Amino acid sequence: MASEDIAKLAETLAKTQVAGGQLSFKGKSLKLNTAEDAKDVIKEIEDFDSLEALRLEGNTVGVEAARVIAKALEKKSELKRCHWSDMFTGRLRTEIPPALISLGEGLITAGAQLVELDLSDNAFGPDGVQGFEALLKSSACFTLQELKLNNCGMGIGGGKILAAALTECHRKSSAQGKPLALKVFVAGRNRLENDGATALAEAFRVIGTLEEVHMPQNGINHPGITALAQAFAVNPLLRVINLNDNTFTEKGAVAMAETLKTLRQVEVINFGDCLVRSKGAVAIADAIRGGLPKLKELNLSFCEIKRDAALAVAEAMADKAELEKLDLNGNTLGEEGCEQLQEVLEGFNMAKVLASLSDDEDEEEEEEGEEEEEEAEEEEEEDEEEEEEEEEEEEEEPQQRGQGEKSATPSRKILDPNTGEPAPVLSSPPPADVSTFLAFPSPEKLLRLGPKSSVLIAQQTDTSDPEKVVSAFLKVSSVFKDEATVRMAVQDAVDALMQKAFNSSSFNSNTFLTRLLVHMGLLKSEDKVKAIANLYGPLMALNHMVQQDYFPKALAPLLLAFVTKPNSALESCSFARHSLLQTLYKV
């Protein structure tokens, strides 16, 4: 490190915050690669008496630097809180596990008794969980109360490793007469899916002391939701349940409602964008009506809830004296339904708790496709049953053919809206309209476009116009989820759209990328374009796109330059950003 760099580092460290047993290097943007780089940080740690909290967020720590920092921590037995989120920016994923192992060993050697461990926004993936697995199983974590692992990309494998480590920690600590009493668990945006969530649910059942669980955006469907619900039932101290942007459907919502009936301490419920639908909302309303006396906030926004179900939810709030917010935005109440909802709450003197209904869909518009929606709901509920019976059907089919019968597409009956008579239809719901999807994109609508969705979207888009291609790309990528079926549908649509565009001689690739950066808020523009709010989907779609043969490699340096620049919107999607950066470095 050059002498001027050392002087700059020393100046930065001089501004280090020290308060109440806490040593903070938060947001200093320190690049600690070698032992020499970390020399002054180590001195600060060594000279700090009674160190209880160490903040390393917003810096980047390499393997060698982590090793010497860990050595300094070996003498800090009073350390209780490790705020170590976002401290591996720009590191290869292979660097992170050994760095975490070293830091963990330092804490174990010190005999620390941790209360809080925050490793959020470190894109370490499943392998990274192995980096702190030994720490979680050690006596240093027998006293752990808060574990925060938001946006780490753990995946199913990482979720299982984490669950096993927590279970082992509880077993070992119980043997010493002081069972692990974890209170706060945060693991949003980790691609846990059903298997990862189910494994963690088993650990939660063993622990039984949880007060807050935050697991939004994990691609969890009703089997995983049901497992979590059963685990929550044996955690009677739960106050906050945040499962935003997973997929409950009616089955998951009903299971969760049964658990809510048994809990008395719940204050905050966030099931927004969870597709609980009307029947699920009614079940939750019934659970709330009979309990949850301390409820302060309920979020059921964007859940495809209709008017009557929404009114049932509102009516369940009658005796909730502590209620501060009820969010039913983005459902299908219609103008009249919104007015009725407000009237119900006004009758309870609770009008002020109702969140905005600005994104509500008109009920009349919804009724036009009501039969199609109901059919889709029935189909989704039958999916699991069909999967379970698939093997039996495959065994029966050869026998039927042997009897001279032709294989046919399974059909079922629904009522004809005009005659009221049963009308045979294919078991799959009618495909959604491409223009409807592009106007109001959602994962469900994309899947309902069917196997030709990618071709249809590409055909619908004028690929000679970069602005229109940007618009289509952002709408498709906005519905990206880590759930396998949605992820593949998004990637296929992106491939069809962008291959058609980039292969066109009239398409201006540079203009496309420039306009894309503008719409993502990464490049300023004179036309004052409103940047999209969430970059996770577009970043994940870009990560896929830049690896394809059709992508002009000459665009990679420009994209890399803008994704590398500091940006608050990018920082909130650190896993997706880190993954894209790793890919771009290889292009």
From Swiss-Prot:
<keyword id="KW-0137">Centromere</keyword>
<feature type="modified residue" description="N-acetylalanine">
    <location>
        <position position="2"/>
    </location>
</feature>
<feature type="cross-link" description="Glycyl lysine isopeptide (Lys-Gly) (interchain with G-Cter in SUMO2); alternate">
    <location>
        <position position="8"/>
    </location>
</feature>
<dbReference type="GO" id="GO:0043231">
    <property type="term" value="C:intracellular membrane-bounded organelle"/>
</dbReference>
<dbReference type="GO" id="GO:0048678">
    <property type="term" value="P:response to axon injury"/>
</dbReference>
<dbReference type="GO" id="GO:0051168">
    <property type="term" value="P:nuclear export"/>
</dbReference>
<keyword id="KW-0995">Kinetochore</keyword>
<keyword id="KW-0158">Chromosome</keyword>
<feature type="site" description="Hydrophobic interaction with UBE2I">
    <location>
        <position position="562"/>
    </location>
</feature>
<keyword id="KW-0539">Nucleus</keyword>
<comment type="function">
    <text>GTPase activator for RAN. Converts cytoplasmic GTP-bound RAN to GDP-bound RAN, which is essential for RAN-mediated nuclear import and export. Mediates dissociation of cargo from nuclear export complexes containing XPO1, RAN and RANBP2 after nuclear export.</text>
</comment>
<dbReference type="GO" id="GO:0031625">
    <property type="term" value="F:ubiquitin protein ligase binding"/>
</dbReference>
<feature type="repeat" description="LRR 3">
    <location>
        <begin position="207"/>
        <end position="230"/>
    </location>
</feature>
<feature type="modified residue" description="N6-acetyllysine; alternate">
    <location>
        <position position="524"/>
    </location>
</feature>
<dbReference type="GO" id="GO:0005635">
    <property type="term" value="C:nuclear envelope"/>
</dbReference>
<dbReference type="InterPro" id="IPR001611">
    <property type="entry name" value="Leu-rich_rpt"/>
</dbReference>
<keyword id="KW-0433">Leucine-rich repeat</keyword>
<dbReference type="GO" id="GO:0090630">
    <property type="term" value="P:activation of GTPase activity"/>
</dbReference>
<dbReference type="Pfam" id="PF07834">
    <property type="entry name" value="RanGAP1_C"/>
</dbReference>
<feature type="cross-link" description="Glycyl lysine isopeptide (Lys-Gly) (interchain with G-Cter in SUMO2)">
    <location>
        <position position="586"/>
    </location>
</feature>
<feature type="repeat" description="LRR 1">
    <location>
        <begin position="48"/>
        <end position="71"/>
    </location>
</feature>
<dbReference type="GO" id="GO:0048471">
    <property type="term" value="C:perinuclear region of cytoplasm"/>
</dbReference>
<keyword id="KW-1017">Isopeptide bond</keyword>
<feature type="repeat" description="LRR 2">
    <location>
        <begin position="111"/>
        <end position="134"/>
    </location>
</feature>
<feature type="site" description="Hydrophobic interaction with UBE2I">
    <location>
        <position position="565"/>
    </location>
</feature>
<feature type="modified residue" description="Phosphothreonine; by CDK2">
    <location>
        <position position="409"/>
    </location>
</feature>
<dbReference type="GO" id="GO:0005737">
    <property type="term" value="C:cytoplasm"/>
</dbReference>
<feature type="modified residue" description="Phosphoserine">
    <location>
        <position position="301"/>
    </location>
</feature>
<feature type="modified residue" description="Phosphoserine">
    <location>
        <position position="442"/>
    </location>
</feature>
<dbReference type="GO" id="GO:0046826">
    <property type="term" value="P:negative regulation of protein export from nucleus"/>
</dbReference>
<dbReference type="InterPro" id="IPR027038">
    <property type="entry name" value="RanGap"/>
</dbReference>
<feature type="repeat" description="LRR 4">
    <location>
        <begin position="235"/>
        <end position="258"/>
    </location>
</feature>
<protein>
    <recommendedName>
        <fullName>Ran GTPase-activating protein 1</fullName>
    </recommendedName>
</protein>
<dbReference type="GO" id="GO:0031965">
    <property type="term" value="C:nuclear membrane"/>
</dbReference>
<feature type="modified residue" description="Phosphothreonine">
    <location>
        <position position="436"/>
    </location>
</feature>
<dbReference type="GO" id="GO:0005634">
    <property type="term" value="C:nucleus"/>
</dbReference>
<dbReference type="GO" id="GO:0005829">
    <property type="term" value="C:cytosol"/>
</dbReference>
<dbReference type="GO" id="GO:1904117">
    <property type="term" value="P:cellular response to vasopressin"/>
</dbReference>
<feature type="modified residue" description="Phosphoserine">
    <location>
        <position position="435"/>
    </location>
</feature>
<dbReference type="InterPro" id="IPR036720">
    <property type="entry name" value="RanGAP1_C_sf"/>
</dbReference>
<keyword id="KW-0963">Cytoplasm</keyword>
<comment type="subunit">
    <text>Homodimer. Interacts with RAN. Forms a complex with RANBP2/NUP358, NXF1 and NXT1. Forms a tight complex in association with RANBP2/NUP358 and UBE2I/UBC9, the ubiquitin-conjugating enzyme E2. Interacts with UBE2I; the interaction conjugates SUMO1 to RANGAP1, and subsequently stabilizes interactions of sumoylated RANGAP1 with RANBP2/NUP358. The complex composed of RANBP2, SUMO1, RANGAP1 and UBE2I associates with nuclear pore complexes. Identified in a complex composed of RAN, RANBP2, sumoylated RANGAP1, UBE2I and XPO1. Identified in a complex composed of RAN, RANGAP1 and RANBP1.</text>
</comment>
